Amino acid sequence: MFSKEDLKGPSHAVQLGVFVDEALSFVDSHGMPLDAVAVSCGPGSYTGLRIGVSMAKGICYGRNLPLIGLPTLEVLCVPVLLHHDLPEDALLCPMIDARRMEVYAAVYDRALSVKREIAADIVDEHSYLEFLNEHPVYFFGNGAAKCRGQITHPNAHFIDDIRPLGKWMFPLAEKEMVRQNFKDVAY
């Protein structure tokens, strides 16, 4: 696995090609086999997703590799599951800022089984009550901070500084590789 971060801000279009070139050069120069390419398939910035998916498809097509698409919200769950001690009945609610008071969010259990599908939500004090009334719910991702003032239920917990980094894709991509759940690079 190759991972590199740039925390300077949204420069996806500028940096991605350079990062990919470095990764492929490293793999090639060290004789390492490349088994597949994993890419985030959203939700998120439409332009950013198009750039990332196009780059991934190009690599897969050129090297005859399978493509693995992973939901960004599931990727956000990985560091929470790895680095936070959650109760058995905890639910995870990753959130991505969708501007204004809207977030892209889903609800998962600790096994990443979907409890509520991905949706664009306008958050208010009644949001997620069907889950909060029954379980501790952990909110995280860049959309969670703006919801802190609206979601005040005692079962609501907020985790800061969770970002969708490439390194968090690995355990999910590995599962998809075993299942041979690949995306079509032609479309």
Protein language model regions, located:
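DPxDG-like acidic metal-binding loop motif
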Residues: 38-72
